[in-house]
């Protein structure tokens, strides 16, 4: 039987809040389902609350609200945080991504998350 995890998009006000919302959707109050992009990808691969047969969907309600909250402004904020700890070898790339986000261009946090879901759980994402 397909399990449906619901993300209430109006509650997603930034990336940190997304981690809380997805954790609760999958694993209940105070649940964990990643606290960074790599951990989120790992959780989607199984063993962290999703069914072993991988028969689940993620229904992201009010996705347009989340898309705005996780847009270029939030992306720039996250990239500034990343820039503070990025290895020198990756600094120029992150600075370029930050410049794009500050100009309102390029991939957003919302894009990062949906791309990870599509990659790790193909066909599981339902944007509403």
Give the location of each predicted region.
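Positively charged, polar, low-complexity stretches
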Residues: 1-128
């Amino acid at each position: 039987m397909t399990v449906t995890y619901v993300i209430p998009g109006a509650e997603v006000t930034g990336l940190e809040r997304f981690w809380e919302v997805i954790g609760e959707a999958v694993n209940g109050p105070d649940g964990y389902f990643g606290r960074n992009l790599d951990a989120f990808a790992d959780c989607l691969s199984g063993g962290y609350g999703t069914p072993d047969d991988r028969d689940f969907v993620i229904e992201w309600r009010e996705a347009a609200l989340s898309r705005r909250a996780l847009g270029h402004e939030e992306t720039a904020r996250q990239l500034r945080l990343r820039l503070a700890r990025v290895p020198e070898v990756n600094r120029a790339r992150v600075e370029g991504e930050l410049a794009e986000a500050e100009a309102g261009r390029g991939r957003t946090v919302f894009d990062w998350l949906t791309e990870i879901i599509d990659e790790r759980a193909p066909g599981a994402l339902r944007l509403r």
